[in-house]
Swiss-Prot record:
The keyword rRNA-binding applies. CDD domains: Ribosomal_uL14. PROSITE patterns: RIBOSOMAL_L14 (PS00049). The keyword Ribonucleoprotein applies. Keywords: Ribonucleoprotein, Ribosomal protein, RNA-binding, rRNA-binding. GO terms for biological process: translation. The gene is rpl14. Binds to 23S rRNA. Forms part of two intersubunit bridges in the 70S ribosome. GO terms for molecular function: large ribosomal subunit rRNA binding; structural constituent of ribosome. This is Large ribosomal subunit protein uL14. InterPro entries: Ribosomal_uL14, Ribosomal_uL14_arc, Ribosomal_uL14_CS, Ribosomal_uL14_sf. Part of the 50S ribosomal subunit. Forms a cluster with proteins L3 and L24e, part of which may contact the 16S rRNA in 2 intersubunit bridges. PANTHER family: 50S/60S RIBOSOMAL PROTEIN L14/L23, LARGE RIBOSOMAL SUBUNIT PROTEIN UL14.
Length: 132
């Protein structure tokens, strides 16, 4: 896992619903925890593009539903600024289910993957068709 080059806005708090962008059988995910988050009193833990989160599968195949799994956020609606000054935002909030080490469980990723997530997680960048 590599550090992030740009300032990512942590716009997805606990309880946020994400689209599952891989072919593991999950359709909709809900964030229940953000890994390595150190916050302040009464503030909800939140994550952004490239962060690892723990999710609960809300919609999907019967085998996948109600499971708690690690995932990596690959897209977010809230715009964030890159080091070169450009601002990036996506159409939806999406994540990919991974193993605890960061290797994707699925064999394909649907839609674009942010450059920040691809740089930080090599396993995700291997499966990405579009890196934006």
């Amino acid at each position: 896992m590599k550090g992030l080059g740009s300032t990512i806005v942590r716009s997805l708090p606990n309880g946020a619903r994400l689209v599952c962008a891989d072919n593991t059988g999950a359709k909709e995910l809900e964030i229940i925890a953000v890994k390595n988050y150190t916050g302040t009193v009464r503030r909800l833990p939140a994550g952004g593009v490239g962060h690892m989160v723990f999710v609960s599968v809300k919609k999907g195949t019967p085998e996948m539903r109600k499971q708690v799994l690690p995932a990596i956020i690959i897209r977010q609606k809230k715009e964030y600024k890159r080091a070169d000054g450009t601002r990036v935002k996506f159409e939806d909030n999406a994540a990919v289910i991974v193993t605890p080490e960061g290797t994707p469980k699925g064999s394909e990723i649907k839609g674009p993957v942010s450059k920040e997530a691809a740089e930080r997680w090599p396993g995700v960048s291997r499966l990405a068709k579009i890196i934006h």
